[in-house]
């Protein structure tokens, strides 16, 4: 009789482990809300100043053209004799130096190269979204490579820009969480 009971239980699936699914993927609407947070960060002066439509970086909270006629150069690191790292060192200077001192980053100050400018300035949300997720227009990066880029010291600088500069208005973790939500929702564009 015990054998019959075991066979019946096995046939009913009683011996199968219960299956659990992980959290549901975010909806398209949740992805769109998350992208608005991403867009807010990317189009803040801390980010867009190095992602202009032209070949000269912008500077300041008002995104004015960079002084000294600084140019992108052949690799996005400035022109010969006027590379970005000529003035921008490996760290932010002490606040005791006052305002308007060139900020720094340990992975070297630079812009995207001229062949892949990745423009953030003036892009409507839909165009910005499509550009970001298109490897043909974003430096050849897939979503994973873009996410890795978000952890670079130069990107993180936006939240610690040094004395006299406004940081990105969205908390860094909130931005990263929004990026993940947008990605998991399938990178929908507005």
Which functions belong to the PLM regions below?
Residues 51-52, 59-63, 96-100:
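Short, solvent-exposed loop/turn and secondary-structure capping segments
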Residues 45-54, 81-92:
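The canonical Cys-X-X-Cys-His
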Residues 22-41, 57, 61-76:
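Electrostatic cytochrome c docking/interface patches
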Residues 4, 42, 78-82:
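Flanking scaffold residues of small Cys/His-coordinated metal-binding clusters
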Residues 1-7:
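Sec-dependent signal peptide recognition
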Residues 12-14:
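N-terminal Sec signal peptide cleavage junction
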Residues 36, 45, 92, 99-190:
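C-type cytochrome heme-c attachment and multiheme electron-transfer modules
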